[in-house]
């Protein structure tokens, strides 16, 4: 039976661990929500364990470094995990061996963003190709500048013909552009398109089990029934 609550205080005694989404739950991309900042402080006073997970395509150090500017104390969180971090670790260390001899990468990202190339730091053993025909895997982080989903079909067809695997660093389908409040597609939309075409897609962010399991590794002897995940999207968080 669904229960509608007015405040986190209504259920705080039922859980020991709180897993929090970032965008839309804690902040709007620019400023932390006052109610979220206050709720985090209250949870800490109640000795609750707090974890942040995000479908950001960036590595987790980026999310950690932003917390202070958004009004949060980074020391309140025992772990911060992003889908980008999960994918970076997988590509770097081949944890699950999703592909053989992955060396040549076609990197989808917005080159107009100052930090667009930061994801490549530490991936020096890989060749980053400008043509998908020269790649044996795709790293999908953020959409190319001024593109729409239909623009990716030729790229995906070429990749599909050669069984190229796609690693999706941000599995969200859409986000909201804060300046004009417009919906913008994320790489989850492109990954879903490739999947429906028959391509192999690796997603380790929400709502997959992997990111939840990884983020909870720093907690010992916890009861799964006393973990609460808080998000703002049924498609992205559940």
Protein language model annotation of sequence segments:
Residues 1-238:
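HAD-like aspartate-dependent phosphatase fold
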